[in-house]
C-alpha cells in the first residue's frame, strides 16, 4: 500500500528509483533518501514534507523539501514502487493544495502549472506564464494575453490554499501519512493504479528524454539539431492527439475544436517568426497536453 511504501522510503528503510533530470546525462539509480539528503547538511533549515496530489489522479504524491535552496524530491507511487523526481528550488515554489505551483528562471520568466508524469520523468504543464525576450509576453494556455490578465491570474493563484508542510521527523511521518491515505484506500485500488490517460502520457516519455538531452555541453549545430528534433516530435504528437479528438467529437463541439486549433496554429506560425525554437516547442508540448486532457475528459485545472 502507498502509505507503507512512502513511510519506508521517508524513514530510509527502503530504496526508491531516483531520477535527476537536471544532470547531464540524466542520472537514475535506486537510492535511499538519506544518500541524497546527506548532501543537504550545510543548510540552516530542517527538511519538510507535504502530501498532495500533484497530477490529479486521486493518488497523492509526497513532496520532500530539502533545505534552503536545495530543491525538492517528489515521491510518486506506481505499480508497488516509489519513484523520486529531483526538482530544483526555483522549479517548485508556492505549492498549493490543488497541486498548482510556480516556477521561475528570472524576474520576468515565471509560470504556474501542475505536474505531469511521463514514464520516469516529470514535466510542468504550464497554465499561464510570462516570457521575457526583447519585451515581456504573457500567455494563458498558449494564447497571448495582456499583463492585466496575467496579474489577475497570478492573484487568483496566490489566493489558493497552500499545502501543509510538516517537519521531517519520524513521528510526523508516522502521524501524517495515514491521515492522507487511509480514507482514500477504500475508494481507490492502489496496487496497480493507472488510467488510460496516464498510459498515453507514458507513451510520450521518449520525447521528454530528448528534451532533456539539450541540458549539456553541445555545439550550436548540435543544439539546433536537438531543438528541431524535439519540435518535430511534439508537433507529430500534437497532430496525433488532435486527430483522435476530431474522431471523438461531433457537431458543434467538433467545430469549436477545429476553429480553436486553426487559431492556435496561426498564432504559433506568427510567433515562430521571432521566437527561439525551444519556446515554440514548449508551446506545442503544452497544446499537446491540453488536447490529451480534452480527449480523456480530464479536468486537470478544474
What residue ranges belong to the model's regions?
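Acidic, small-residue rich beta-repeat scaffolds with periodic aromatic anchors
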Residues: 1-19, 102-192
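Blade-edge motifs of beta-propeller repeat domains
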Residues: 1-43, 81-91
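Core segments of small alpha/beta cavity-forming domains
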Residues: 16, 20-22, 45, 52, ...
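Beta-propeller blade termini
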Residues: 45-54, 92-100
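Acidic/hydrophobic-patterned starts of short beta strands in beta-sheet-rich repeat architectures
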Residues: 55-65, 98-102
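Short, surface-exposed coil-to-beta transition loops
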Residues: 59, 69-72, 86-88, 105-113, ...
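Beta-propeller blade repeat segments, especially FG-GAP/WD-type strand-to-loop junctions
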Residues: 71-85, 115-118
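N-terminal alpha-helical modules
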Residues: 180-181, 186-302
Amino acid at each position: 500500500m502507498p502509505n507503507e511504501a512512502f513511510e519506508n522510503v521517508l524513514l530510509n528503510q527502503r530504496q526508491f528509483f531516483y531520477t535527476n533530470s537536471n544532470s547531464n546525462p540524466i542520472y537514475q539509480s535506486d537510492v535511499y533518501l538519506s544518500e541524497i539528503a546527506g548532501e543537504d547538511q550545510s543548510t540552516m533549515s530542517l527538511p519538510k514534507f507535504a502530501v498532495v496530489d500533484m497530477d490529479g489522479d486521486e493518488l497523492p504524491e509526497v513532496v520532500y523539501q530539502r533545505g534552503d535552496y536545495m530543491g525538492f524530491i517528489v515521491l510518486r507511487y506506481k505499480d508497488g514502487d516509489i519513484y523520486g523526481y529531483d526538482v530544483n528550488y526555483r522549479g517548485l515554489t508556492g505549492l498549493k493544495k490543488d497541486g498548482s505551483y510556480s516556477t521561475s528562471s528570472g524576474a520576468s520568466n515565471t509560470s504556474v502549472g501542475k505536474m505531469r508524469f511521463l514514464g520516469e520523468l516529470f514535466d510542468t504543464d504550464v497554465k499561464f506564464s510570462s516570457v521575457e525576450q526583447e519585451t515581456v509576453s504573457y500567455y494563458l494556455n498558449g494564447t497571448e494575453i495582456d499583463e492585466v490578465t496575467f496579474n489577475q491570474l497570478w492573484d487568483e493563484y496566490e489566493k489558493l490554499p497552500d499545502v501543509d508542510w510538516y517537519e521531517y521527523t519520524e513521528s510526523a511521518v508516522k502521524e501524517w501519512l495515514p491521515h492522507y491515505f487511509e480514507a482514500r484506500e477504500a475508494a481507490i485500488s492502489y496496487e496497480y493504479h493507472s488510467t488510460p490517460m496516464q498510459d498515453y502520457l507514458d507513451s510520450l516519455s521518449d520525447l521528454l528524454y530528448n528534451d532533456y538531452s539539450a541540458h549539456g555541453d553541445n555545439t550550436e549545430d548540435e543544439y539546433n539539431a536537438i531543438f528541431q528534433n524535439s519540435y518535430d516530435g511534439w508537433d507529430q504528437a500534437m497532430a496525433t492527439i488532435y486527430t483522435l479528438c476530431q474522431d471523438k467529437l461531433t457537431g458543434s463541439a467538433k467545430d469549436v475544436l477545429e476553429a480553436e486549433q486553426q487559431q492556435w496554429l496561426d498564432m504559433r506560425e506568427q510567433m515562430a517568426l521571432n521566437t527561439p525554437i525551444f519556446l515554440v516547442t514548449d508551446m506545442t508540448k503544452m497544446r499537446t497536453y491540453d488536447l490529451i486532457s480534452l480527449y480523456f475528459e480530464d479536468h486537470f485545472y478544474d
